[in-house]
Amino acid sequence: TLQANNQSGRLFKIITIPNKMPGDIFEEKKLTIGFDPNLFTDKSLFFFFRKSKLKFKPIYQNLIDKIWERKIIKNKNKFYLLPNGAVSEKYQLKVNKISKYLKRKKSDFLFVTASENNAWLLNIRGRDTKYTPIPHSYILIDKNKNIKFFCDLKKVSSSLKRGLKKVNFFDIKDCAKILLGIEKKKFVIDDNSCSFFFKTIIDKNNKILNLQDPIYILKAIKGKREIENIKKAHIYDGVALTRYLFWLKKNFYKKNITEITASQKLLKFRKKNKKFKFLSFPTISGTGPN
């Protein structure tokens, strides 16, 4: 917030959440606000606008997309399976746990919209975002362990299909149509992540249980192999950071080192490890007033 004021305070009015919520801006006005139902949950809308008298109208075509002329082309990097040494459980065992959970809840389906949970469940990763190895996807799993995986099919390789033999792959654009074809069933959805769009579709002909996605708890319990790999990752990164600090101490007064060149040097040290894939976040590099 401090940096926002310094950089943009003259051009924009900076409002800090939670000191002031978006709904507070409109005060007592009775307005109708359009929103993209794919990008919001009804829970998030209520949280940000709970004190307002606004009405919300879903707009099913994103208006920003209509005027975005130079849109970034999405990458086509393939999804990939994690090696056996990187996981503590095969995906079939994880699916068994979900099946038992659904039977306990007397439910037919779990609809998973959090991509990181899909990655954990199937022991896969992707490169759909710059700093997090998640595959943008949805999963529909029933109590009988049948799995429908919705994604960009161009990112599904033959090796991925071989490794996930019991998973049925569908184009992500067909997800809504398939959900609309299901009737008189009981769904578990997490309204912290399931969009207004999908919740409305499911709720049309089915009963919904709003519960936390059970995968959050399951993946929080780390296995022995996962714990070992976490420790190794910290050691690998610690070695790179130690080399960088030694270099910085040696060259601090000899070279003109900027915030940018410093972060680039640290990245070079990290890349010397053959197991390095990419950063988990941009290096926070600051000096002087920053």
Show where each model-derived region lies.
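A composition/biophysics-driven feature that prefers long, compositionally simple stretches
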Residues: 1-271, 281
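Short, structured beta-strand/loop micro-motifs enriched in basic residues and often containing a Trp
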Residues: 285-290
